[in-house]
Amino acid sequence: MLNGMTDPTVLINLSISEAAAMLRQGETSSLALTEASLARIQQTEATVNAYATVPAELALEAARQADAELAAGNDRGPLHGIPIGVKDICYTKDVVTEAGSKVMEGFVPDYDSTVVRKLNEAGAIMIGKTRCHEFAYGVNEPPTRSPWELNSYPGGSSTGSGVAVTVRSAYGAIGTDTGGSIRIPASFNNLVGLKPTYGRVSAYGVVTLSWTLDHVGPMTRTVLDNALMLGAIASHDVNDATSAREPVPDYTAGIRDGVKGVRIGIDREYVMYPGVVDDVRAATESVISELADMGAEIVEVSLPEFELTPETLFTVMMVEASTYHRQMLREKGDLYDPTTRATLQLGELVPGTHYVTCLRARERYRSAIRDLYQREQLDALISPTMPLPTALLSDLHQPRKDMDIGETPMISYIHHTFSANLGGQPAISAPCGFSSAGLPIGYQLMGRPFDEAMLFRIAWAYEQAHDWHQRQPTHVYD
């Protein structure tokens, strides 16, 4: 019997914080963690297809270097020596970056994206590039499979990042979020996923979907791990004009302070709309009730101008995506998936006046959200992350049978997520139970700009009362 230092069945189930503690106590090594992750990739990849590229030798070399640095007393922080997945739209020097598209097939950047550079500076081990929808916008082919139900949608566009962390082949992963693409797979995979405040994490070197809506953030198994990852990747970046200058705090400093006196708002009319299924409704109401029992103040509110946001988000995203891809569409249009190409071309037909009108509507919405937080003295807003658990891949674009308005699952999935992209405020999804079919359910907290620490504090308090985050889809490993 191998001991905990080398037994991969022990190592892969450690959280980032647990693995970091073992590294510093000499109970394991970065090399052992990395070998365990690579073994898990080999065991699960044929089933779930989470990775686009696995640079195993580079990862092993980095792990040996991490061990040598730690032995010499050069401790880079809590991610030092920890295997992390990176969404394949983030540039990685000397490692192929394809963004899920034949358009970029074989492309090897000559520099790292800032988020990858920050991970490297923190001593993290890039275990692999995770699969995503084409340019974080189109299709996911060949499809990444949900480890909870192989014929169901695992969420996207940070598809592989969510699945990799779920099957324990990475301890955490980087995702991106333009309308929900971190929080959707986090909810579907029983993970913690954070979309930080706009500009909190640099998007330099990340393939653009929508300049004014894109966010880069962490996906992890626990709230504490998420706080540790955000602390490592958040910074001001002179290479990114949208990067914020706000100082980066220690996100773990007040994480255990509890929720007594914390004010959490809910607009039940909006967040519990008819598309929310009973299992999700009950799970979310349970979170609200438990937080109230812990001392939080639950405040009934009305969200502002919500009828503006769907059109605003889609218009801005379509125009900015088509602008970014205009030259590539003309030069390599035949290499795009037809669905992606058609969607991008549609964005070119949107009048400039309509785009500007939507930008102005977004600013009115942002102002109204800020006023709501100030007027009601809110620390967060709460909702389900997803109105329903994941659907079968074959049903994603079919009208839901439980609704009479023709809404498809893919439209339902962004109902609660896209407003945080428009508002630019931070939003986190965390586990809160399972459906009657055994599928994960997540709840969402949206906070004040640059107050990710409060979201971690609330989510950590709830996490301590349950073991939801510890449950995993063991059938995938059989």
Name what the model sees in each region.
Residues 1-60, 280, 293-295, 354, ...:
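An N-terminal boundary/leader segment
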Residues 7, 79-99, 253-268, 316-370, ...:
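Short helix-loop capping/hinge segments that flank enzyme active sites or metal/cofactor-binding pockets
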Residues 17, 43, 121, 125, ...:
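Structural helix-boundary/capping segments
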Residues 19-25, 85, 103-107, 214-221, ...:
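Short, well-ordered beta-strand elements within core beta-sheets of diverse protein domains
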Residues 27-35, 64-67, 276-302, 325-331, ...:
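Acyltransferase
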Residues 79-216, 267-269, 381-405:
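Short glycine/serine-rich loop/turn segments
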Residues 96, 419-422:
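Conserved short alpha-helical elements in the N-terminal third of ANL/AMP-binding
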Residues 102, 106, 144-145, 242-246, ...:
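Short, surface-exposed loop/helix-turn segments at secondary-structure junctions
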